[in-house]
Amino acid sequence: SGAGGGGGGFITSLSGGSGGGSSSETAASLQPSTNYTITVGAGGAGAVYNTSGAIGASGQESSFNSLISKGGGGAKSYGGGGQSSGANNNKASGGGGSFLTSIDSLSSNPGTGTSASRGYGGGLGSTGSTNGAPYCGGGGGAGGAGGNGGGGSAGGAGGAGKESVITGVSTFFAGGGGYQSATGGGAIAPTSAGNGNSGTSGTGGGGSGANHSYSVGYGGG
């Protein structure tokens, strides 16, 4: 199963905190009749299917005036760890899940996330399958870390998104993608070989992995 991409960073001034266990931001003081720049970053493209060592692109950053949130980390396949997506930026997101093959048994670390990065890290890959195909980790979300691979018969679940009523309706944002679904993350992956699904538009969720060793998820915007 392919590794899931990380969800985008989640930042809010509402109660309940921002992603990764961080505190809520101070509410912005906006002035009437003033133009403010808003940029909505696109999700990162998934890696090419059936390509050894492929890695999905990280999502692009989103911004409101001077407040910046990095996109989700892309997941890497075939013996590598996921991208942490702007780990040196204090608005970075959770990282993509990792992939580990039963062929090379290399250590495969997922992308990281911290409270300062507004997202949790991805899950670890595993070689625990019975048919030689590895189980991959889920991508980290704003509300929780990605699940490790090897639990049951598939890859790890994506990390949960962060629940917010910013739109007036309770919604989970910036969930990590995984072979198994997660609140706010990518939909359940395809059951045949191929690329994973994209995350849900407008939520910053990471894309799912897929039921194939070389497929990886998309990074959330």
How would you describe each model-predicted region?
Residues 1-221:
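Low-complexity, glycine/proline-biased repetitive segments and flexible coils/loops
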